[in-house]
Structures are given as structure tokens and as C-alpha cells.
Amino acid sequence: MSRKCEICGKGPSFGNNVSHANNKTRTTWYPNLQKVKAVRNGSVQTIKVCTRCIRSGHVTKAI
């Protein structure tokens, strides 16, 4: 299971946590993915979508 949005392709980003003492430790930030039942190609499928795509209306939710 990949941590990637199936609509826009947004995935994890990498960087450093930096303390006040300027110590750096590697970290990973993951997108806010939700499992949504959506209509794709005329059928209902469960897909993982980021909240940005849900809010902007790129996903047609199944009722």
C-alpha cells in the first residue's frame, strides 16, 4: 500500500527536524490520505485520496 494520492500523485516529503540547538534529524511528512468510495470509470471503487483533492472537488463520491 503506497502512501500516495491516486488523483494528484502527492506522496511523502522528506526533510529535517531542527531543534533550537540546531540538531538535525531526518523526518518524513505524509499527506493526509483518506479512503473514499468514489466513482471511477463508471464503477464504484475505494481509492486513497488526499484531503486537498476531496475539498477541491476532484473526486466524485459514490452515494
Swiss-Prot record:
CC annotations in GO: ribonucleoprotein complex; ribosome
Q: Which GO terms describe its biological process?
A: translation
Q: Which InterPro entries match?
A: Bacterial_rp_bL28 (IPR050096), Ribosomal_bL28 (IPR026569), Ribosomal_bL28/bL31-like_sf (IPR034704), Ribosomal_bL28_bact-type (IPR001383), Ribosomal_bL28_sf (IPR037147)
What gene, per UniProt, encodes this protein? rpmB
Q: Which SUPFAM superfamilies match?
A: L28p-like
- Return one GO MF term: structural constituent of ribosome
What Pfam families would the database entry show?
A: Ribosomal_L28
UniProt family annotation: Belongs to the bacterial ribosomal protein bL28 family.
Task: Quote the PANTHER family the UniProt record gives.
Answer: 50S RIBOSOMAL PROTEIN L28, LARGE RIBOSOMAL SUBUNIT PROTEIN BL28A
- Top-level division of the source organism's lineage: Bacteria
User: What protein name applies here?
Assistant: Large ribosomal subunit protein bL28
Record's keyword terms, sorted: Ribonucleoprotein, Ribosomal protein
